[in-house]
Amino acid sequence: MKAILRASRIGRVILRYRLDALLEGTPAERWLRLAKPFVPRASAEIAAQSRGARLRLALQELGPIFVKFGQILSTRRDLIPADVAEELTLLQDRVKPFDGQAARLIVEAALGLPVSVAFASFDTVPLASASIAQVHAATLPPDANGVRREVVVKVLRPDIERQIDADIALLHSLATLVERTHPRADKIRPREVVAEIEGTLAAELDLQREGANASVLRRFWEGSDDLYVPEVIWSHTAERALTLERVYGIPSDDIAKLDAAGIDRKALAAKGVRVFYTQVFRDNFFHADAHAGNIWVDSDPERRLNPRFIALDFGIMGQLSQEDQYYLAENFMAIFHKDYRRMAELHVEAGWMPSNVRIDELEAAARSVCEPYFTRPLSEISLAQVLIKLFRVAQRYELTLQPQLILLQKTLLNIEGVGRQLDPKLDIWAVARPVLERILRERYSPRRVLRELGKRLPEIMTHAPDMPRLVHSWLKQQVEGRHQIDIRSPELLALDLSLRKLQTRVVTAITGSGLLVVAAVLYGLHPDGWYLGTVPVWSWISGGAGSAALLVAWLRR
């Protein structure tokens, strides 16, 4: 019954904000048409608004869970029009706070201690309140030196899980209906969108997981002059309560306060771009909710000329597969070099597009997207917009993107927005390019390869004895299979040639890998004999020969 009443209310809001066109061609449109005479017409002020603004206002009226839904939907620029996405980014996740005494009870239940024991003080008036949780100021009991450390405690709303489950169940029902009846369901993919929203909300409901995210990010940026991450107080953290070191700063979009504090905004803007690319390509762990409210600037007067950011809210973090990391970095470099052919090839090699796509057509599409940008001043070029438009054009060719890549698009857009707000003349390309080049050099350097081999040495040594037998068995099967096939057609001849080349490449690659294993073993054993630096000469020779063999195998692609 509650679900029916909730669905009825959603229908009334859709009609009042003139959003029924979104359901055109579905059974829901017919039901809404019947209900239309009984719903008050939209005011002239609402009717004059754009469709994106009307959707934003409707979501705000439907409540905090739908606000969160709109915020997540704003990241899916591959699914919704750009004007609607822009409007949805304006959604503010601010709601009326819940009772401070209720917050105390939740903290006590989570920590298994009375608040008066766990904390020296706990302010029942929240510092901030959102749809999932609210934040309270507190101090820890005195330490050995008698110091009471300032902290903040993030507390989940009471009964929030039940509310979310009910709304998500309703969204699943609506998504199923849209998928069955909407003429563009294959493009919108409603069930996929709702599943993504459900996953994001589930992550935000586990504050212990958020604490782990903060802890990992802090470890990556320990001692950095570019980014500070508050310390997690694990003794006072549980699934429904997260305690962090209290930090003080200025929101990154408060330009007046930044200028009053004498902050070097130009240096700060460049640092923001560098931090983002380092998180993505060095650490593979990036803050994926990096809007101005979650990015502060350290207000310490001593940091005026060497400012640093402070990260807040670690509920949504992003990671890419190693393959996506590589292809994305290569894609950016291809954009920098205006190598449209390589961009097209990378989209296919990454598995983002079907292998039967014509590369020349994709190359022409990439050229049509990028060339107009290259005629603009560098300060007006947005790498995020180029990437989004590339992916949007590629949708015509059955582009398939992982949710993490879509999350990265949205984060890049936010970071560029923050950077340009701090420094309107920021040249994103000039800042990003050297960072990408350095990270790619480091990522694929011989030293790093040897280090990774060293880490995987136990695994390699475990499987190494089986390799000759497996290779011999595979080659024997190839030879026997080739003798059994009577090749007549040009296609089969071409296939045979490809198999021969593949066989040669596999043997060369296995030989190279074996030599690198030998090099790593020699390095680990510290044998007697000649050394070059701290590495045995024979390790250098074996490693060099192995690298050469792998290079030959790679060049024969």
Curated annotation (Swiss-Prot):
Coarse class of the protein's main subcellular location: membrane
Keywords associated with the record: ATP-binding, Cell inner membrane, Cell membrane, Kinase, Membrane, Nucleotide-binding, Transferase, Transmembrane, Transmembrane helix, Ubiquinone biosynthesis
Gene that encodes the chain: ubiB
Residues involved in ATP binding: 127-135, 154
Originating organism: Xanthomonas euvesicatoria pv. vesicatoria (strain 85-10) (Xanthomonas campestris pv. vesicatoria)
A UniProt-annotated Pfam family: ABC1
GO terms classed as biological process: regulation of ubiquinone biosynthetic process; ubiquinone biosynthetic process
Active site: 289 (proton acceptor)
GO cellular component: plasma membrane
The protein's role, per its UniProt record: Is probably a protein kinase regulator of UbiI activity which is involved in aerobic coenzyme Q (ubiquinone) biosynthesis.
Name of the protein this chain belongs to: Probable protein kinase UbiB
Domain of life according to the entry: Bacteria
Pathway: Cofactor biosynthesis; ubiquinone biosynthesis [regulation]
Annotated family: Belongs to the ABC1 family. UbiB subfamily.
Domain Protein kinase: 121-509
EC assignment: 2.7.-.-
Subcellular compartments: Cell inner membrane
Transmembrane region(s): 506-526, 535-555
GO molecular function: ATP binding; protein kinase activity
Top EC class, one word: transferase
PANTHER family: CHAPERONE-ACTIVITY OF BC1 COMPLEX CABC1 -RELATED, PROTEIN ACTIVITY OF BC1 COMPLEX KINASE 7, CHLOROPLASTIC
Mode of membrane association: Multi-pass membrane protein
CDD domains membership: UbiB
